[in-house]
């Protein structure tokens, strides 16, 4: 019973999005950025208490539409009453705010990904409403290259046992695990990629595989995902263009408040532009402080060591790892920059 909460400003204000495609068909999504999962499903809505053994999700929706959710599709049934049901299994830990539903008359677009060493053959799915299929097909051609570049820095995409998918959403975007929401304009920037698409896909490592236990450390998820955009420029266009991109990010830093504002914060208290753009600049500065060899070793280990991967982390975890790898105590750096 009851009536689902409507998202008044998705994805920043949580709830369901009831929209229509240009032809008038239903186009439905749900967002729960930060605190918000419990707006529509029963959970202890805190990042430190995620379903660490995955979850099962079942959707029932009008026949003729496509119903998508997180994880791997394990069953699809025509109920014979004008509805259909899809069942999904999430095989990894998943944070509460990453659980989602998408319903529309979607068209499936696919590219194949062969891995950073050529040993994989994985489908990369893009589910798009029909009116935008032509634009989506053009944009989606970049996705194998995006995954290869990010994979060389962070390790292979971390959820292939479920799937890799992006879904066209009736709102700007969100890093929903294995079914990333994209609602921008299918337009590349002057560095040759779509900022939103790359940022949200980078969250599959930074936010989904690696999740903060306290929203006070929100900058780890958003700062690393933003810095991933700069690393993509570095690895595809070189150091000079990387510096140009970092200069562009620098324009968004206003030093209005600390990046880490305390402990035991809500996502609303922790959220600001600083966690994105100054967070990325903290990582850029750290790269120059400890050097490329140690810096990229830290990044790789933070994303892949069993003590962090598919688990919960903090700023202190990152600081300790930096000290271990570099052999330097740089408490002054964290105090000054965060």
Predicted regions mapped to residue ranges:
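Juxtacatalytic substrate-recognition/specificity segment
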Residues: 57, 84-87, 105-204, 208-217, ...
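Short helix/loop segments within enzyme catalytic domains
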Residues: 232-254, 295-299
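Extended, low-hydrophobicity, Ser/Thr/Pro/Gly-biased non-transmembrane segments
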Residues: 2-106
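Amphipathic alpha-helical substructures
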Residues: 158, 240-241, 272-338
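Soluble non-cytosolic domains of exported or imported proteins
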Residues: 51, 133-144, 188-192, 196, ...
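Active-site rim elements
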Residues: 37-48, 130-138, 215, 266-273, ...
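The feature captures the short pre-catalytic strand/loop hairpin that immediately precedes
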Residues: 254-269
């Amino acid at each position: 019973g009851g009536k689902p909460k409507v998202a008044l400003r998705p994805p920043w204000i949580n709830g369901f999005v009831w929209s229509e495609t240009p032809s008038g068909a239903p186009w439905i999504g749900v967002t729960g950025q930060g605190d918000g999962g419990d707006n529509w499903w029963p959970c202890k809505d805190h990042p430190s208490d995620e379903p660490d053994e995955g979850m099962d999700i079942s959707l029932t929706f009008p026949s003729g539409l496509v119903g998508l959710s997180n994880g791997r599709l394990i069953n699809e049934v025509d109920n014979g009453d004008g509805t259909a049901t899809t069942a999904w299994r999430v095989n990894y830990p998943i944070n509460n705010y990453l659980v989602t539903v998408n319903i529309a008359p979607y068209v499936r677009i696919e590219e194949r990904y062969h891995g950073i060493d050529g040993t994989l053959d994985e489908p990369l799915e893009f589910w798009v409403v029909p009116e935008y299929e032509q634009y989506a097909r053009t944009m989606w051609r970049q996705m194998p290259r995006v995954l290869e570049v990010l994979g060389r820095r962070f390790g292979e995409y971390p959820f292939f046992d479920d799937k890799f998918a992006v879904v066209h959403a009736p709102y700007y975007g969100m890093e929903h695990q294995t079914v990333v929401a994209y609602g921008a304009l299918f337009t590349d920037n002057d560095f040759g990629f779509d900022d939103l698409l790359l940022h949200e896909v980078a969250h599959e490592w930074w936010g989904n595989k690696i999740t903060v236990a306290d929203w006070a450390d929100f900058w780890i998820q958003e700062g690393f995902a933003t810095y991933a955009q700069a690393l993509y420029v570095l690895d595809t266009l070189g150091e000079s263009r990387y510096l140009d991109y970092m200069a562009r990010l620098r324009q968004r830093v206003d030093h209005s408040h600390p990046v880490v504002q305390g402990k035991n914060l809500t996502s609303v208290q922790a959220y600001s532009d600083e966690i994105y753009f100054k967070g990325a600049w903290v990582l850029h500065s750290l790269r120059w402080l400890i050097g490329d060899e140690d810096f990229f070793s830290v990044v790789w280990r933070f994303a892949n060591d069993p003590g962090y991967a598919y688990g919960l982390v903090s700023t202190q975890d990152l600081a300790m790892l930096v000290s271990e790898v570099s052999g330097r105590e740089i408490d002054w750096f964290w105090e000054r920059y965060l």
